Amino acid sequence: MGTVIGLDVRDGRLPDEAFEAAIGWLTDVDLRFSPFRPGSEISRLARGEVASEDCSPDVRFVLTRCEALRGETDGFFDIRGPGLRGGLDPSGYVKGWAVEEAAHILEAAGARNYVLNAGGDVVLRGAPEEGRPWIVGIRHPLESDQVAARLAFEPGPGRMAVATSGLYERAGHIVNPRNNEVPAELLSMTVVGPSLALADAYATAAFAMGREGLPWLASRPGYAGYAIDRELRPSWNADLESYLAAAASSTGPARQD
């Protein structure tokens, strides 16, 4: 996926086979889905060399989910278009989905307290140690070595996810369908929720929506957003307040989104 993978597991040593399986899965996804690889299924599909019904089950699943998300977001999440590499690029969903599936592999091997970070797409569960939350830092959109805000995640029954879309990521491929232009109102949009696949896609859509992104996210049960506009002014949903407040009272280091 052209990104760096970071993993912190606090459950003791997991079997080497679990790590190998997770990395193997992510490598396989990159080989099949990357629009930058001429021989990938996605590239061949974009060129019309294969039909969607002849693609692998995973590719067909992703195409179906992306089409559903296009409808859910009123076209603000769209994997097809002239501004996308080859006219077809599902990366805005695939990355989060692939990392989430890798987390399933680790959990099947016994991981219950971990953070998995793939180039800023973060999925986490449990806690680093008893009485402390995981801390995730939202990257400053203009200063890559700075953190714009910190979010704290207390231990819960399931996993949580953080995904960001912004100018430093792939905004040149994010287009407002109303005017076919790159969004001009925001520098970044971060989404928090239980599914990394959806958080990734929602961040892309909400970034494209500009100032309407946060109100739209408020209508997505379980999801909340943190936006930074062109004047570096932050704004966020009410549901995100608890994560910000918890981080303000914690002294732990932040893992950058």
What residues fall within each predicted segment?
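Mature catalytic core of soluble alpha/beta enzymes
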Residues: 1-257
